[in-house]
């Protein structure tokens, strides 16, 4: 606030220095209004009068601790403990602020007079007279009321209206205002509000913690807010703890805890230490068998801890428990016992949070972080029988280890108490470093140094002695070992030896038994967390777990181990897991063991679905069928249930619905239109579909039948997993993590809004939770975009799996063709076409298929579209959606079209489940099927976790095998590798002989797209490597599995994981796929030497003669190339003002290494005196201007920060000519053949359709040139400009095709390293006469205003006169949960690339907005062929078109052109947000949007050298756009800001202050540090070498906010 006020005042002060009285009056009014607003804001805070006299430091303490109040310090009362007494009233007001006004409130031990003065008639105070001090306090409060009334009577005033109800209540019924009973026995008030509250200000100490919850419940208290004094040091063994801020102290004697003030002896309060400790450590306070109060700490202010106790109903805990008994009473009893156990366990776990979590302790006890408790060993010189008191001290852990590590290096002779004390005292005192006195890092009380030194010395001596004894291995000498030990101790302690010996033996640090010696090194310290747990355990007994029953049950399992021991890897068998599964499922362990042995030995005659006999699998296979009789849901029953009609299903609530069993003999799977339709899934209980184990664990029949059964079960498992996930999400939306959030959606029917917004719309089905909290599967219908919900629905959950009826439709289709519950196996001939990579399998399918009678099926949608496109390329439509389909489409829509085909062609069939292939062959009713695939590439992968997919079921049974062993893609060296994988001779047609190479990199840190660009397609083995490369800035990265079947010219294969990866081996199909994707070259980047490197090295060593043997001559082949296309309110946390100039310099050097070392002060001089060769087009040079006139150089301030900034240059012939060549000459010529007029009209049509709101289009009859528009233009001009128009008659115009040329003397800083190798050219200004601007300025200003009014401002922003706050508001409604592609179009040579086409587009836009035809022709004439004259440098030249940098339409024209360019190439109808400013643009599209080739379109149509970048964070006009879950924040580029701080053109201190003010205006958002981590990520995306920069952001804020500190950044 202070910073904003200071910046406002400075801006107003600079404005007031002007001579315009109107501006001065407006500035004065604005200053007055700002001051009034600030005062009103302060006045709205609650007011508290602080009457007691306190010091200035104490005033600051109170103000900082309670910023919620407007505190007025009168200093009219002198009293003891003034600060503590005054803070008590602030604490009471703070507690009352937490309570809704007017709610019935109990003030436990409170001050009823204070509430009466505030007029709180809803507060009841419990003020028991526990001792005489309470009686005195009660009488004092009565006296204060009488004193107040007497003052009112003396002044002849009446009681104010807001106090009168409370005084009336006290007069009529004093017991309703205050009672003298403890809170536990208070009878309360008769009339209460809906919710009752309580406050306890320093009164919890006297209420037993065990009775507190019950007392609150008796008064029906909803929430209780409390405050009490406490100190972490109370957990030490010290008897005295000081509270310095309020001048008080605690003293402890056993369980008696006394509280007193330092300068006051009469106020002494005594409490129970154990009771106070319970309030600190306990989390829950039971009130009844049902209710409990949960404690939560709020804040700590001036030695006072604030917390609240919330009332909770434990009956809302989940009560469900599984029970198999038939006795209802026993069932209900077991349920109650289980629930009470769960309730108690939940509360105990809540209480243990503080005791078990060290981070929680550090949060609530911040002073104790990194502090340890060290014992002190007292040296006694008195008689033996004297008992010594134990003492402990809390010191820094770092200090302890610094001392111990140092003195442990001492030799035996040097290890004395004196040396230890000397070292400890030296590191505690001040030291001198390089002539500068530095304060010690550790603030340890000097009174403790001697005792601490003794502890460190004794600890080290014992530890070294123990090490010596271990080394010597107890060798026998003339003296016994015990004598050696005592000799060493005597030498160390000299005359103190007898007492030290007694101390060591009494403390049991050394145990002596005759000549046996035992040395025990004591614990060095105890952490604060351990002491907290110890103190709490001493008063609260922790529960102990009884494990006897589990041990007895585990013992029974050993009888079954003798049967299992004969199996391989039987030592890895987990007995405990096996025991739990057998007990849960009711399986005899001995029987299970025998079945395992029989199955593994192939003696059982059964095929089990699991791959190996694990503990769970065996128990599941032997589980008996369980029929559930619970009402209210549809249940799955055992296989002996016969066929049921719909009526029977409804009556019995039973259906045999999912899965297949080998012993099914009923007709339950017969085809039935009524049962087999998708409607059977509607409103079916989720428990029916969610299967926690296989419905059939044993498959029988031929292999194809078993494969079909396993495939159907896999579909059921997939549907079960989807429903299970939705059921979990619908009950707990907070459980969705960020990675999976975009896959799910949860709709609240009551609120009519999405709690979790899904990425897509129009889901086919979902999971519904009704008013009874039961979940069902529902087929969704829509009314427009809204879901049609039932009356009892509460929530609807959807996911990416529920977009279509995928698994449901497949299950329906497959079950419709079952015969007697068994799959039908077709008699068609199945031929496997096994082809090597790149053999042309798709081309062969197109050549063999007859689309009139055959069917082509492919796994993916894109592959199907590709085949249809290639088949119809001749113009004749032969391939349709009926004969070329995806596998999913064929299964889900089975029966709705042709069902019989002659031949079936299945592309990439080996990537499908073999059971799916068998079903496809049978359902197509074909006579012959061709399955195309690659037996050596990646096969079908089971995507459902925990679903069993035995290995023997993965083999596809076929009748014939055809091989294709000629690759059209792979080079010769890869063909040599393929011959090692395939049977038969593999040949190639490629002319490339060698294509492989590899490079071992030092680590993942070296991967950077700038320093190490990767050629071609980037492929990784794992998703983690893919994510890492994408985060480093690489684009278009995919895994090996994702690119199977695709072809690329060049491939970069990357491995950044040093740990072993299972899929990287010589036998892995992933290796084969990765090495066979390229046609020209592949390079492998790896951090370790692995199997891939071994293969590549072997291929590099193969002779060229041998590789030529694998080549064959063929005609020109055209291989399909598949290439990827480029596709609220902010939280405010004030930034700490820390850091130094060195921080900013370090950050600049890390981001732009080397720029600060460039000495460019005399580059302009060097340019003048050396010979230069320039490529100049036709121009006229006045060589008399080649030597610039001598001018006195202005003195400037010298910046402290070293950057690449240059001093202002002097205009001259050479300097201006270089700038003209750079900015105006040598314009690019990339455009193709363009029909300018027609194309411009089409582009403008797209521009108006994309950006303008049709309802707001401007009518044609609005005058553009009027007195009002001219006055608006004049108001924006400077006085010097108006003076040039004094003699202008507005009758005739100067030549509109003539422009003046000049340069900007200050070079523009670029945030790259080009300054190290280039001489940057200056920016030019090409401008018209002011007389021309006086005519066209108002016209285009009015056109611009009307254009911006018609723009759809909710989606588009044309950045004209916008503030950073307006930018934040524009982007604030971006949904951070919706994946987006952020695009930036970077155009080089933007101004001089604009030609006749750009002018035509711009003129067409102005004409449609209403520009007069005559003015349009004049303006067009002035921008076709133009003359530039530079009178200062003596240069004259002619230019065609181009954008003039000083024209009246320069900014808006550039903005319009970039917007029109993007609207002509990109699908703007899908755009979420877009912003344009000059040649800058930022676009937000939905993730995955397809984009055309931007570079080609920009070149051929717009003559632009353009590149389209996809970013994670937007960068617009030198600002980072950070969108987050609360909105958006715009940060000014910190590197650009630091670069400006190295400016060398600052003239004087006044100029410097103006410079600081301008920087404050643009960089104000840096004062909010809440999103610094996001800013680090955004900067790291643009500048790869940038370190985390929160330290430099704080330093920038520090210097910009302080006027005097900012002056130190520049020297005279």
Swiss-Prot record:
Write down the InterPro entries for this protein, in alphabetical order.
(+)RNA_virus_helicase_core_dom (IPR027351), Alphavirus-like_MT_dom (IPR002588), DNA/RNA_pol_sf (IPR043502), P-loop_NTPase (IPR027417), RNA-dep_RNA_pol_alsuvir (IPR001788), RNA-dir_pol_PSvirus (IPR007094), ToMV_Hel_N (IPR049329), Virgaviridae_RdRp (IPR047310)
Outline the extent of the RdRp catalytic domain. 1380-1493
Q: How is its activity regulated?
A: In resistant plants, is bound by host protein Tm-1 (e.g. tomato Tm-1 AC A7M6E7), thereby inhibiting replication complex activity.
Q: Report the residue ranges that make up the (+)RNA virus helicase C-terminal domain in this protein.
A: 965-1117
Q: What is the effect of changing residue 1098 to N?
A: Weaker inhibitory effect of the tomato tm-1 protein and enhanced viral replication efficiency in tomato plants. On the contrary, abolished replication in tobacco plants
Whether Electron transport counts among this entry's keywords is: no
Start and end residues of each stretch annotated as Helicase:
831-1086
| A single BP term in Gene Ontology | RNA processing
The entry marks the following residues as binding ATP, namely: 838-843, 870, 968-969, 1077, 1098-1101
Q: Does the keyword Transferase apply?
A: yes
What reactions does this protein catalyze?
RNA(n) + a ribonucleoside 5'-triphosphate = RNA(n+1) + diphosphate; ATP + H2O = ADP + phosphate + H(+)
The annotated consequence of residue 299 to R reads: Increased ability to multiply in tomato plants but reduced infectivity in original host plants (e.g. pepper and tobacco)
Tell me one Pfam family matched here: ToMV_Hel_N
> Per the record, which residues fall in region Methyltransferase?
52-466
How does the record describe its quaternary structure?
Heterodimer of a large and a small subunit. Both large and small subunits interact, via an ATP bridge, with host protein Tm-1 (e.g. tomato Tm-1 AC A7M6E7 and AC A7M6E8).
- Give the free-text miscellaneous remark of the entry: This protein is translated as a fusion protein by episodic readthrough of a termination codon. When readthrough of the terminator codon TGA occurs between the codons for Gln-1117 and Gln-1119, this results in the addition of the RdRp region to the replicase.
The protein depicted here goes by the name Replicase large subunit
């Amino acid at each position: 606030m202070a910073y904003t006020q200071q910046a406002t005042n400075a801006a107003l002060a600079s404005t007031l220095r002007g001579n315009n009285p109107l501006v001065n009056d407006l500035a004065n009014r604005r200053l007055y209004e700002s001051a009034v607003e600030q005062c009103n804001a302060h006045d709205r805070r609650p007011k508290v009068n602080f009457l007691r006299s306190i010091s200035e430091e104490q005033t600051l303490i109170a103000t900082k601790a309670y910023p919620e109040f407007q505190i007025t310090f009168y200093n009219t009362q002198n009293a003891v403990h003034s600060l503590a007494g005054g803070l008590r009233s602030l604490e009471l007001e703070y507690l009352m602020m937490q309570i809704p006004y007017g709610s019935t409130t109990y003030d436990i031990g409170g001050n009823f007079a204070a509430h009466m003065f505030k007029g709180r008639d809803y507060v009841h105070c419990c003020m028991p007279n526990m001792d005489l001090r309470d009686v005195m306090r009660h009488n004092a409060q009565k006296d204060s009321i009488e004193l107040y009334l007497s003052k009112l009577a003396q002044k002849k005033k009446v009681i104010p209206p807001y106090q009168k109800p409370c005084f009336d209540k006290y007069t009529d019924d004093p017991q309703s205002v205050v009672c003298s009973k403890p809170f536990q026995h208070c009878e309360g008030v008769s009339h209460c509000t809906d919710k009752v509250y309580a406050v306890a200000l320093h009164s919890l100490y006297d209420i037993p913690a065990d009775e507190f919850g019950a007392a609150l419940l008796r008064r029906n208290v909803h929430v209780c807010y409390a405050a009490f004094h406490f100190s972490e040091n109370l957990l030490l063994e010290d008897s005295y703890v000081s509270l310095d801020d309020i001048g008080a102290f605690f003293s402890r004697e056993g369980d008696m805890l006394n509280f007193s003030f330092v300068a006051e002896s009469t106020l002494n309060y005594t409490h129970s230490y154990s009771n106070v400790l319970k309030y600190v450590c306990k989390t829950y306070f039971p009130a009844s068998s049902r209710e409990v109060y949960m404690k939560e700490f709020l804040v700590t202010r001036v030695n006072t801890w604030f917390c609240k106790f919330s009332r909770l109903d434990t009956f809302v805990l989940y009560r469900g428990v599984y029970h198999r008994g038939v006795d209802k009473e026993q069932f209900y009893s077991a349920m109650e016992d289980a629930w009470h156990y769960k309730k108690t366990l939940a509360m105990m776990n809540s209480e243990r949070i503080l005791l078990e979590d060290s981070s929680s302790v550090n949060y609530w006890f911040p002073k104790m972080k990194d502090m340890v408790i060290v014992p002190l060993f007292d040296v006694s010189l008195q008689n033996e029988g004297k008992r010594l008191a134990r003492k402990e001290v809390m010191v820094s852990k770092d200090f302890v280890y610094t001392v111990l590590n140092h003195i442990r290096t001492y030799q035996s002779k040097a290890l004395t108490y004196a040396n230890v004390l000397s070292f400890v005292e030296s590191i505690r005192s001040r030291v001198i470093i390089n002539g500068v006195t530095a304060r010690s890092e550790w603030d340890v009380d000097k009174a403790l140094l001697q005792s601490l030194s003794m502890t460190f010395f004794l600890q080290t001596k014992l530890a070294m002695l123990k090490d010596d004894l271990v080394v010597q291995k107890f060798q026998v000498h003339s003296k016994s070992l015990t004598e050696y030990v005592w000799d060493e101790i005597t030498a160390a302690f000299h005359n103190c030896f007898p007492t030290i010996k007694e101390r060591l033996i009494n403390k049991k640090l050394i145990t002596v038994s005759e000549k046996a010696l035992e040395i025990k090194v004591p614990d060095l310290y105890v952490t604060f967390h351990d002491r907290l747990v110890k103190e709490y355990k001493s008063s609260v007994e922790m529960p102990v777990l009884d494990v006897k029953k589990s041990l007895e049950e585990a013992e029974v399992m050993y009888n079954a181990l003798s049967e299992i021991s004969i199996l391989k890897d039987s030592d890895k068998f987990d007995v405990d897991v096996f025991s739990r599964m057998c007990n849960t499922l009711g399986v005899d362990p001995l029987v299970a063991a025998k079945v395992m042995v029989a199955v593994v030995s192939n003696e059982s005659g059964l095929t089990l679905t699991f791959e190996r006999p694990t503990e769970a699998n065996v128990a599941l296979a032997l589980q008996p069928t369980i029929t559930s009789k619970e009402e209210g849901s549809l249940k799955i029953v055992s296989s002996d249930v016969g066929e049921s009609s719909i009526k029977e299903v409804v009556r019995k609530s039973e259906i045999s619905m999912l899965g297949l069993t080998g012993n099914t003999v009923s007709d339950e799977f017969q085809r039935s239109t009524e049962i087999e339709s998708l409607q059977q899934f509607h409103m079916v209980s989720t428990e029916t579909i969610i299967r926690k184990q296989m419905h059939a664990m044993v498959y029988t029949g031929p292999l194809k039948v078993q494969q079909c059964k396993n495939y159907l079960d896999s579909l059921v498992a997939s549907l079960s997993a989807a429903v299970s996930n939705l059921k979990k999400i619908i009950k707990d939306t907070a459980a969705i993590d960020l990675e999976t959030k975009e896959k799910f959606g949860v709709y609240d029917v009551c609120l009519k809004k999405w709690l979790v917004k899904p990425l897509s719309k129009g889901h086919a089905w979902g999971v519904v939770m009704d008013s009874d909290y039961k979940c069902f599967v529902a087929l969704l219908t829509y009314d427009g975009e809204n879901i049609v919900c039932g009356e009892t629905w509460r929530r609807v959950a959807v996911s990416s799996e529920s977009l279509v009826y995928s698994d449901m439709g497949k299950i329906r289709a497959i079950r419709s063709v079952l015969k007697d519950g068994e799959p039908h196996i077709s008699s068609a001939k199945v031929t496997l076409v096994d082809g090597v990579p790149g053999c042309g399998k798709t081309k062969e399918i197109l050549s063999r298929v007859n689309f009139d009678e055959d069917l082509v099926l492919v796994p993916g949608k894109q592959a199907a579209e590709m085949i249809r496109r290639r088949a119809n390329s001749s113009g004749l439509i032969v391939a349709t959606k009926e004969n070329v389909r995806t596998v999913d489409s064929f299964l889900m829509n089975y029966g709705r079209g042709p069902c019989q085909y002659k031949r079936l062609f299945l592309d990439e069939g080996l990537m499908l489940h073999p059971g799916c292939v068998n079903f496809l062959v049978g359902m197509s009713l074909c006579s012959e099927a061709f399955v195309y695939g690659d037996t050596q590439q990646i096969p079908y992968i089971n995507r459902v976790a925990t679903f069993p997919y035995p290995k023997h079921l993965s083999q596809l049974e076929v009748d014939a095998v055809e091989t294709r062993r000629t690759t059209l893609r792979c080079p010769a060296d890869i063909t040599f590798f393929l011959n090692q994988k395939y049977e038969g001779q593999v040949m190639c047609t490629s002319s490339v002989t060698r294509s492989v190479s590899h490079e071992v990199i030092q680590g993942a840190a070296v991967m950077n797209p700038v320093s190490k660009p990767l050629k071609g397609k980037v492929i990784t083995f794992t998703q983690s490597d893919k994510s890492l490369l994408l985060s480093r800035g690489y684009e278009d990265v995919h895994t090996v599995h994702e690119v199977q079947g695709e072809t690329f010219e060049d491939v970069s294969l990357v491995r950044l994981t040093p740990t072993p990866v299972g899929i990287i081996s010589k036998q892995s199909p992933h290796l084969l796929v990765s090495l066979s994707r390229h046609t020209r070259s592949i390079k492998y980047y790896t951090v370790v030497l692995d199997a891939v490197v071994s293969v590549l090295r072997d291929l590099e060593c193969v002779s060229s003669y041998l590789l030529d043997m694998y080549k064959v001559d063929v005609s020109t082949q055209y291989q399909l190339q598949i290439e990827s296309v480029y596709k609220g309110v902010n939280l405010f946390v004030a930034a700490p003002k820390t850091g130094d100039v060195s921080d900013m310099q370090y950050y600049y050097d890390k981001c732009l290494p080397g720029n600060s070392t460039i000495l460019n002060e005399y580059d302009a001089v060097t340019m003048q005196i050396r010979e230069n060769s320039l490529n100049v087009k036709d121009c006229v040079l006045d060589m008399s201007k080649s030597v610039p006139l001598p001018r006195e150089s202005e003195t400037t301030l010298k910046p402290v920060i070293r950057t690449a900034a240059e001093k202002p240059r002097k205009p001259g012939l050479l300097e201006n000519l270089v700038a003209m060549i750079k900015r105006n000459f040598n314009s690019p010529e990339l455009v193709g053949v363009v029909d300018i007029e027609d194309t411009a009209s089409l582009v403008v049509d797209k521009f108006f359709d994309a950006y303008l709101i049709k309802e707001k289009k401007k009518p044609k009859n609005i005058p553009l040139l009027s007195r009002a528009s001219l006055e608006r233009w004049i108001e924006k001009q400077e006085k010097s400009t108006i003076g040039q128009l004094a003699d202008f008659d507005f009758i005739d115009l100067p030549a509109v095709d003539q422009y003046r040329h000049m340069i900007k003397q200050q070079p523009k800083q670029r945030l790259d390293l080009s300054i190290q190798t280039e001489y940057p050219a200056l920016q030019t200004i090409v401008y018209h006469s002011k007389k021309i601007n006086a005519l066209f300025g108002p016209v285009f200003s009015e056109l611009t205003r009307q254009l911006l009014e018609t723009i759809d401002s909710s989606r588009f922003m044309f950045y004209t006169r916008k503030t950073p706050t307006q930018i934040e508001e524009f982007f604030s409604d971006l949904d951070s949960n919706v994946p987006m592609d952020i695009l930036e179009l970077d155009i080089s040579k933007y101004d001089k690339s604009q030609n006749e086409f750009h002018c035509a587009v711009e003129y067409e836009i102005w004409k449609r907005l209403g520009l007069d035809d005559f003015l349009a022709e004049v303006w067009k004439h002035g921008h076709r062929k133009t003359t530039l004259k530079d009178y200062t440098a003596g240069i004259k030249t002619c230019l065609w078109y181009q954008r003039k940098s000083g024209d009246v339409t320069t900014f808006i024209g550039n903005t319009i052109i970039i917007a029109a360019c993007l609207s002509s190439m990109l699908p703007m109808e899908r755009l979420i947000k877009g912003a344009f400013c000059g040649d800058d643009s930022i676009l937000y599209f939905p993730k995955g949007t397809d984009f055309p080739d931007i570079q080609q379109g920009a070149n051929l149509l717009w003559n632009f050298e353009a590149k389209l970048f996809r970013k994670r964070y937007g960068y617009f006009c030198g600002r980072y756009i950070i969108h987050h879950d609360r909105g958006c924040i715009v940060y000014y580029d910190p590197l650009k800001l630091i670069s400006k701080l190295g400016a060398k053109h600052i003239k004087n201190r006044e100029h410097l202050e103006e410079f600081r003010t301008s920087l404050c205006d643009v960089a104000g958002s840096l004062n909010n540090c809440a999103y610094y981590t996001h800013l680090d990520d955004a900067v790291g995306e643009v500048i790869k070498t940038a370190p985390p920069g929160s330290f430099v952001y704080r330093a920038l804020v520090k210097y910009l906010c302080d006027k005097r500190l900012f002056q130190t950044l520049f020297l005279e």
